[in-house]
């Protein structure tokens, strides 16, 4: 949803009801909990399955469901809020404006009350005694939230009841509603107890997860799959830039850059900038929501006389929590990266211009700095450093007040790389976006550039840590393993990049000094040659940790790894993870061109199968990164990666049209056979990295010997006019990359209606109103350019007809008079 999603897994060792809503027994003793944690996954599965078959006396009184709190309304006639339907209608309006902020929590039902529990701390947030719940209702398929549980509660101290709305995904709202209603009925003293039967019905209705496979879950790939081999070679920039060797091939590359290449680079940078602005806006909204909740909580505490927690204060307390420090750090890094991109794009973007966006960014930057209590946290964010162009651009653009804020953030925001000690390790910045988007890979080759080299350094810097993890995994591979993946994921490192000046340079350089002995047991070349396989999900599966993937019934999934009982698959959104193979049906491979394309970074450069360690007088060894530079290798002709389509122009920041050549060209493919490694010998992870470094360097060196052209991609352009239908408007909005809220809100208008809206009206309808207005302005200008010449010709034709008619009436053709007009 649009709230902060917790990755904390309920697991089988705690309360089984936390996953699929089955009843759990009262809290165990310490000894019981320790014994339960040691119980095998298969036994726990059998225990869960037996809940539905047990006698009435064995059904527990406590059930728990993971839900998302959507909002709470006060039922007041003055606000036209009387029924649940009124609340759903207002929820739709908030959702259309992007103002619904969800909060994950556990809803617990027992024989006395309905409680809301914090997922992380397990503290009770709210407690609604059953006698205070006046109405319980399930609302399905009413809006984008398709399974809503509505609770109307009124405590004796309240003058008006509250309407609480929850989204229920894991267990549907109608089942939870039946559980609550049966508990309310039983609490009123009915002769026949309804709740045991209701819990039994829930257990039968919820499919749960399939029986566990007998074999252990497959060991997930480590860093090699998180950051592919191609992107890992990017770490070269960190050392080559220090040695002054990076700028030479880059300068030559820029001289050889064609208009098509330049357009692709600009479009890529603009897309990255747009996603940075979106993430910053989302974070600011999150801060504002927390501030609003804190303000409301403070008002309630001041107005009430007793210290007893009032209704709704528990949820408010949870919503008033500020984001964790890591999210603040990520936001500061995106500010710095955004400034760098604006400096690069200052002569390529308009409406708004780069200068306007700089002023725009300083306002939320000031808010975030104040929210952290001062510039201390921001000044500790070292990576990414601002470039010299960025510093010059900010000095020229920033106002006095903005410059004061900028300078207060310290050296990490002011000094460029050349001003830092050469031995100071500056961790490369790898942007991570909230929606999982990754920048598209450019469809041409050239010398390594900063954009191409983000992700490698992260992988290489963590290579030593990965080697230790792999060794640890191998030592325990044949020991007793759970039939399910562990609740906290697999044994690979998901640690983020190092930041700040605290990173030890010696540790950072250590992966370059030693080659791990462990060899990676994965043949990626063989995998790449196999046709893609697809499977359809037979029913829903809910992921319990970050390594698994939640799927819905009838989802079509691409099979990435089917060598074990748990298969690694990728869904239509590009998310990948592990699911049990017994919930999947193998499908016939779709026809060519059907199905989704690979994510941009899943394409890897073809590996040169050269034997690393080849030494000769005319082929010196490839340079290894710091501390000691090495001779430059003789260029080897590289293979050409698969072309990737040029990304479309982003929606919210437009760029000036640059002239480009339509002449087709061809990539000169140089081929050469290399010595291959023995088949029975697999390269270690570090050897693969070094091979890719060697190959990437040869790509940059051989650029001077080759001139190539990239053929212009024929991308269909979607435009709208005043005569466009609502369907055409909707297609145009989707082609510009607007989110579903914007598409659904504006997709009902025709072209004339859409063009008639101003910026304020668009902002009131959808959160991306300003971006839509910019695109509409571009469309209007294009229409004026295309229609201007035809309108002029029409005017001249009518004028000539009048002149001809007047001349024929007088018997004289007055050409001079006509020309004077």
Swiss-Prot record:
Intracellular or extracellular location(s)? Cytoplasm, Cell cortex; Cell projection, Ruffle membrane; Cell projection, Growth cone; Cell projection, Stereocilium
Which residue windows does the record flag with biased composition (Basic and acidic residues)? 464-476, 670-683
Outcome (variant: residue 706 to A): Impairs both actin capping and bundling activities
Helix bundle 1: where is this region?
A: 717-737
PROSITE patterns attached to this UniProt entry = SH3
One Gene Ontology term, aspect cellular component: synapse
Report residue spans for region: Disordered: 1-39, 204-224, 295-320, 461-525, 610-683, 800-821
The segment(s) forming the PTB domain are 64-194
Alphabetical GO biological process terms: actin crosslink formation; actin cytoskeleton organization; actin filament bundle assembly; actin polymerization-dependent cell motility; adult locomotory behavior; barbed-end actin filament capping; behavioral response to ethanol; cellular response to leukemia inhibitory factor
Report residue spans for region: Helix bundle 3. Answer: 761-766
Q: What is the effect of changing residue 628 to A?
A: Does not detach from actin following BDNF treatment
Where is the region Helix bundle 2?
751-756
Coiled coil regions, renumbered to chain: none
Q: Which UniProt keywords apply?
A: Actin-binding, Cell membrane, Cell projection, Cytoplasm, Membrane, Phosphoprotein, SH3 domain, Synapse, Synaptosome, Ubl conjugation
Q: Which Gene3D superfamilies does this UniProt record tie to the protein?
A: Pleckstrin-homology domain (PH domain)/Phosphotyrosine-binding domain (PTB), SH3 Domains, Transcription Factor, Ets-1
User: Phosphoserine is carried by which residues?
Assistant: 58, 475, 624, 658, 661, 684, 810, 814
What job does the chain carry out?
Signaling adapter that controls various cellular protrusions by regulating actin cytoskeleton dynamics and architecture. Depending on its association with other signal transducers, can regulate different processes. Together with SOS1 and ABI1, forms a trimeric complex that participates in transduction of signals from Ras to Rac by activating the Rac-specific guanine nucleotide exchange factor (GEF) activity. Acts as a direct regulator of actin dynamics by binding actin filaments and has both barbed-end actin filament capping and actin bundling activities depending on the context.
Record's comment describing the protein's domains: The effector region is required for activating the Rac-specific guanine nucleotide exchange factor (GEF) activity. It mediates both barbed-end actin capping and actin bundling activities. The capping activity is mediated by an amphipathic helix that binds within the hydrophobic pocket at the barbed ends of actin blocking further addition of actin monomers, while the bundling activity is mediated by a compact 4 helix bundle, which contacts 3 actin subunits along the filament.
UniProt name for this protein: Epidermal growth factor receptor kinase substrate 8
Organism taxonomic ancestry: Eukaryota, Metazoa, Chordata, Craniata, Vertebrata
